[in-house]
């Protein structure tokens, strides 16, 4: 068995100074049991922990590492910026214009864009902007969709909130909750009903076009187009939260994959290349309401800092130069087929959902199309599965309700190893 002595010691020490011993709840292994693994190094598709154990990484820092960890072009660009430019000035820099222009070129909905420091900042800012633009207060989100830890979004949220078994959080006021309406993912009638019941009061509908924090749930054919039409008919701002799926499922994000253009888009993860970053953008007539041009306030001390922009710019350039998407699709499809074959051999019929290089194996036989069906998954079995995979050197998300990310650095040999480990882990999970 792998030894995790130093990780256990570090976790005990961390709990003295950090709430729960972690800086993000899902990292605490509450959902799967056991002690969090402390990582010491990441290279390519591999992580090494503080006890010297090596793992194939399918978490990818929760999505940013589509090119693997420590890509040589990105590290070289960061080294140049550190040595020759600096870390932050609190002033405009030329690089801000370069990345903004590139994002507007790549993402269909973007005519103007504002850089921020996280996905949460991006979604909070986009919702504030939608409210300012429309003069309305209420928003519609979808049960299980996670849009960061802003108060407006912690109502039937996904990801860590699902892991805790508490979809909302103390500290979110009743007034805030009343302004956040929840619809059922992939159910347009549930959205229409809320719009009708709150006529002329809905500022925005915000959605993950590929839900990635309730496992992975793709939008059904026509669902996003129906939302687009509904928003057009009712003067509602349509926001695509592409913090996770943006630049992951396609270069132009899910909106280019599905051919539906929102009014506003939020981004993060991949556009930071592993450093903290976020962005929101969209139609010029809406974005012109953002201060200092308009009256909707948004600001950030470190927004647009050279380090984060360097990593993001180089990542985008590599994605454009190398077009890894066909190869990512091939690799992710190999894993999906391998897992399916394993389940057939074992007489299992668990659900797999996948869009491009983001996927999820749900420990349920119920088709997963919404929050309600996602939570039929057996988290006890997932916990056993997770620890068996970990023991075999495969690092997955320590939660049933997160995505598995394939990167361009995963080799065919890595995929074979993962499929073999999956066969063993499925047997243990179901024993």
Swiss-Prot record:
Enumerate the Pfam families for this protein: Aminotran_3
Which parts pass through the membrane? none
Give any GO molecular function from the UniProt entry.
pyridoxal phosphate binding
Cite the entry's keywords alphabetically: Chlorophyll biosynthesis, Cytoplasm, Isomerase, Porphyrin biosynthesis, Pyridoxal phosphate
Residue numbers bearing the N6-(pyridoxal phosphate)lysine modification? 269
At the top of the EC hierarchy, this enzyme's class is isomerase
Please give the pathway this protein is involved in: Porphyrin-containing compound metabolism; protoporphyrin-IX biosynthesis; 5-aminolevulinate from L-glutamyl-tRNA(Glu): step 2/2; Porphyrin-containing compound metabolism; chlorophyll biosynthesis
Q: Where in the cell is it found?
A: Cytoplasm
Gene Ontology CC terms? cytoplasm
Q: Which GO terms describe its biological process?
A: chlorophyll biosynthetic process; protoporphyrinogen IX biosynthetic process
| EC number(s) from the headed UniProt entry | 5.4.3.8
Q: Which residues form a coiled coil?
A: none
Protein name, per record: Glutamate-1-semialdehyde 2,1-aminomutase
């Amino acid at each position: 068995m792998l030894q995790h002595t130093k990780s256990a010691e570090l976790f005990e020490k961390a709990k003295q100074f950090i709430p729960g011993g972690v800086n993000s709840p899902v990292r605490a292994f509450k959902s799967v049991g056991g002690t969090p693994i402390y990582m010491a190094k990441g290279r390519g598709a591999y992580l090494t922990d503080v006890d010297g154990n090596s793992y194939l990484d399918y978490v990818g820092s929760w999505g940013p590492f589509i090119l693997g960890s420590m890509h040589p072009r990105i590290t070289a660009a960061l080294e140049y910026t550190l040595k020759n430019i600096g870390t932050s000035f609190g002033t405009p820099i030329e690089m801000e214009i370069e990345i903004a222009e590139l994002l507007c070129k790549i993402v269909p909905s973007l005519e103007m864009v504002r850089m921020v420091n996280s996905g949460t900042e991006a979604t909070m800012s986009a919702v504030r902007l939608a409210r300012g633009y429309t003069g309305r207060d209420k928003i519609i989100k979808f049960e299980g969709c996670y849009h960061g830890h802003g108060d407006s979004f912690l109502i039937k949220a996904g990801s860590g909130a699902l892991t805790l078994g508490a979809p909302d959080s103390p500290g979110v006021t009743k007034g805030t909750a009343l302004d956040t309406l929840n619809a059922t993912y992939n159910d347009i009638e549930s959205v229409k009903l809320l719009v009708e019941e709150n006529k002329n009061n809905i500022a925005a509908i915000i959605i993950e076009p590929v839900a990635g924090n309730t496992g992975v749930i793709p939008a059904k054919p026509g669902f996003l187009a129906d939302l687009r039409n509904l928003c057009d008919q009712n003067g509602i701002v349509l926001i695509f939260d592409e913090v996770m799926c943006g630049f992951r499922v396609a270069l132009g994000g899910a909106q280019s994959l599905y051919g539906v253009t929102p009014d506003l888009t939020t981004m993060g993860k991949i556009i930071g290349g592993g450093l903290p970053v976020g962005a929101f953008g969209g139609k010029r007539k809406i974005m012109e309401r953002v201060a200092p041009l308009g009256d909707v306030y948004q600001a950030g001390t470190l927004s647009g800092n050279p380090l984060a922009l360097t990593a993001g710019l180089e990542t985008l350039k590599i994605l454009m130069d190398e077009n890894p998407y066909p190869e990512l699709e091939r690799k992710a499809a190999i894993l999906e087929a391998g897992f399916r074959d394993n389940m057939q051999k074992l007489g299992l019929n668990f659900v797999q959902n996948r869009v491009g290089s983001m996927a999820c194996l749900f420990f349920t036989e119920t088709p997963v199309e919404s929050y309600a069906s996602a939570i039929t998954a057996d988290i006890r079995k997932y916990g056993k599965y997770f620890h068996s995979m970990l023991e075999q050197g495969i690092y997955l998300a320590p939660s049933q309700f997160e995505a598995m990310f394939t990167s361009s650095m995963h080799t065919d040999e890595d995929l074979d190893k993962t499929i073999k480990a999956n066969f063993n882990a499925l047997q243990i999970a179901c024993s």
